[in-house]
Regions:
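Early transmembrane hairpin module of multi-pass membrane proteins
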Residues: 53, 57-64, 82, 93-98
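Topogenic membrane-insertion module of multi-pass membrane proteins
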Residues: 1-45
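Intramembrane alpha-helical segments
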Residues: 2, 78-80, 84-170
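Alpha-helical membrane-inserting segments
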Residues: 27, 31, 56-60, 106-109, ...
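Membrane-embedded alpha-helical segments that form the functional core of polytopic membrane enzymes
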Residues: 26-27, 36-63, 119-132, 172-177
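Hydrophobic, lipid-facing residues on alpha-helical transmembrane segments of integral membrane proteins
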Residues: 18, 22-27, 48-56, 154-161
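Cytosolic, membrane-interface loops and tails of multi-pass inner-membrane proteins
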Residues: 1-6, 63-87
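Alpha-helical transmembrane segments of integral membrane proteins
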Residues: 7, 16, 20, 41-45, ...
């Protein structure tokens, strides 16, 4: 595979994992629709935010697992683009930054459409922080038994709950089920 090629990036963002983000936004939007609050533009921005955050998390994971020695070029399972040398360090860091900025742009749109509820900025920022610190930083959550909790929150409750909230303007217990 050619270094930094489109096929290398497709491998790195792990498209097979993106269905999780899509499904969670669809669930939150379906609940909003059922309750009469569906807002297509908000749903689309939630989808962009969720998918770009998933891509960010996948790229950070690809990079940091290799740097920490968890992934090697000869690992069992799907190839990891950085471990295989398909993406350079500089390109990987740029890709992480680009997907993070795309998520921030979608988040800014959601913030504006929410009427500038600034506490939502904290939620968006926490999504970014946890996407990084799942496998990055001095105390990666995935390596200290906290990965499952982070996944339940940031790839479960938060996407469904906030997709609903941003469309309906309130909470529903159904989003936690």
């Amino acid at each position: 595979m050619k270094t930094n090629s489109l096929s290398a990036w497709i491998l790195a963002i792990r498209p097979y994992s993106l269905g999780n983000s899509v499904i969670l936004i669809l669930i939150g939007s379906a609940l909003a629709f059922t309750d009469g609050g569906f807002r297509p533009v908000v749903a689309l921005l939630c989808l962009v935010f969720a998918v770009t955050m998933q891509c960010t998390a996948n790229l950070v994971n690809d990079l940091c697992d290799f740097l920490k020695g968890a992934d090697r070029p000869d690992r069992l399972g799907p190839d990891r683009a950085f471990a295989k040398g398909y993406i350079t360090l500089r390109a990987m860091k740029s890709g992480i930054a680009a997907f993070t900025l795309a998520a921030c742009a979608a988040g800014a749109g959601l913030l504006a459409l929410s009427g500038w509820n600034w506490w939502l900025l904290l939620v968006g920022a926490s999504c970014i922080v946890f996407a990084y610190f799942y496998t990055a930083g001095p105390w990666p959550l995935a390596y200290h038994g906290m990965g499952d909790i982070a996944v339940i929150l940031f790839f479960g409750l938060i996407p469904v709950g906030f997709t609903y909230y941003l469309q309906c303007g309130g909470w529903s217990g159904e989003t936690a089920v």
